[in-house]
């Protein structure tokens, strides 16, 4: 048995049994404890999302809630929303979509808790806020070793594994256009272009990352959702039957009993968790960068990111595939080729070009969002400019190499590290959940008094944070 085989087995066990229990349990628990905050205060989140960025004493714009939302959505909305959903349908059938939706609805509560905690325990350095699970593990739990372990896992997963995967998916999307693509120089040329473009963005710092994300993500999300709506309108007579099939297959007891690990339940839940990342500890790294008056405001904004990712974008992919009538088979016609063929069946060949363009836009936004997460954690381990620049060079190299080869070992390692990362984060937010609930109570109390909520640490019995009067 090779090391890659061991990683695959560990990955299957972790996602099928351990993470499903922890993340689904966490979603249910926090939904109950917050009284469904992801539904009750959703309109507040939309309002805060649109608040304009303020300027600092030097006249420089601060990171707004919207920019922080776009950075986290950039990371969430990658090729997994296209290729990943196709694979889920091919392997788990239409019923997987229902469980994916349910995970997003429940996961919104976990996303709220972790992002609120990231805001509460963020730090300010060189005029910019940073934070995330590593920071609340150190500042609130007093366990720096736990934060360092989390940071190492996240860096391996996002900076190297997932960014290599995004680059490879962009490269593989060109196979439709260039015969014998893998044996040409085009993968290397694409690798150079992607590496150069990513370098330009990341050396511009958080403001450039936020600006690029806030341009690419909203435009592409709207275009992609519109494409989904057009496809559904062209097949409107079939929609009732498709929705009925999704719900029937979701509760197909015979299929579930026949093989739980490969059932629609497990595949849908795994895809939902993998796509929206709620509770996994990645998005809080972006949440902490926002300059807001109350931590709850950014917690609510991050709920929207989960819904954008799964309820809107993943659902658009699912509907485009299901109405096409094109059959997907794992290993034969799955992932990107499945989507390209399904779209062309609906709207003609131009749909293939649209999917290719979407893959490039979503994947590039993911590259810079993933990098931002990793940078925050490098600085947590050691705040060194030399280390940061060396790290940036290695990230660029991973993207360059990822465009040229299928590094399945690296990606399996990334999946395993993300699993461990999620376990560490879920333990932390369970331990710190009451802090987030006190902060939520403070927000709702001020809101009932007709105030625009402002947060100060002593109001909820905290000390040692940036939230001083």
Which residues are covered by each model-predicted region?
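Extracellular/periplasmic helix-exit of transmembrane alpha-helices
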Residues: 112-122, 126, 227-245, 253, ...
């Amino acid at each position: 048995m090779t090391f890659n085989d061991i990683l695959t087995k560990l990955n299957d066990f972790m996602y099928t049994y351990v993470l499903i229990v922890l993340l689904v349990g966490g979603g249910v628990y926090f939904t109950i404890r917050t009284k469904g905050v992801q539904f009750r205060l959703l309109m507040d989140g939309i309002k805060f999302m649109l608040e304009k960025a303020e300027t600092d004493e030097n006249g420089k714009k601060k990171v707004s809630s919207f920019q922080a939302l776009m950075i986290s959505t950039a990371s969430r909305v990658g090729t997994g929303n296209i290729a990943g959903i196709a694979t889920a349908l091919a392997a788990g059938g239409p019923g997987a979509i229902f469980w994916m939706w349910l995970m997003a609805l429940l996961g919104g509560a976990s996303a709220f808790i972790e992002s609120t905690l990231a805001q509460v325990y963020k730090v300010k350095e060189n005029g910019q806020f940073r934070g995330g699970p590593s920071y609340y593990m150190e500042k609130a739990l007093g366990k720096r070793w736990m934060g360092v372990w989390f940071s190492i896992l996240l860096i391996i997963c996002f900076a190297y594994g997932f960014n290599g995967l995004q680059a490879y998916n962009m490269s593989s999307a060109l196979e439709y256009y260039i015969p014998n693509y893998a044996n040409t120089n085009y993968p290397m040329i694409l690798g150079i272009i992607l590496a150069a473009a990513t370098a330009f963005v990341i050396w511009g710092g958080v403001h450039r990352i936020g600006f690029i994300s806030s341009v690419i993500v909203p435009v592409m999300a709207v275009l992609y959702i519109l494409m989904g709506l057009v496809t559904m309108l062209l097949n409107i007579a079939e929609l009732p039957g498709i929705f009925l099939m999704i719900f029937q297959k979701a509760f197909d007891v015979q299929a579930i009993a026949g093989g739980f690990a490969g059932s629609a339940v497990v595949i849908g839940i795994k895809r939902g968790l993998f796509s929206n990342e709620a509770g996994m500890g990645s998005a809080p790294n972006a949440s902490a960068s926002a300059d807001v008056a109350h931590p709850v405001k950014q917690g609510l904004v991050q709920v929207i990111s989960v819904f954008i990712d799964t309820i809107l974008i993943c659902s658009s992919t699912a509907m485009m595939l299901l109405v096409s009538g094109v059959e997907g088979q794992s290993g034969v016609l799955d992932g990107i080729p499945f989507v390209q063929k399904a779209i062309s069946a609906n709207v003609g060949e131009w749909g293939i070009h649209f999917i290719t363009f979407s893959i490039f836009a979503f994947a590039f936004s993911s590259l810079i969002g993933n990098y931002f997460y990793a940078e925050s954690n490098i600085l947590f381990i050691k705040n060194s400019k030399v280390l940061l620049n060396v790290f940036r060079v290695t990230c660029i190299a991973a993207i360059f190499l990822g465009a040229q080869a299928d590094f399945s070992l690296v990606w399996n390692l990334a999946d395993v590290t993300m699993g461990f990362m999620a376990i560490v984060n879920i333990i932390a937010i369970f331990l710190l959940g009451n802090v987030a609930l006190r902060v939520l109570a403070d927000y709702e109390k001020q809101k009932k008094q007709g105030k625009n909520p402002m947060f100060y640490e002593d109001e909820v019995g905290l000390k040692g944070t940036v939230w001083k009067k």
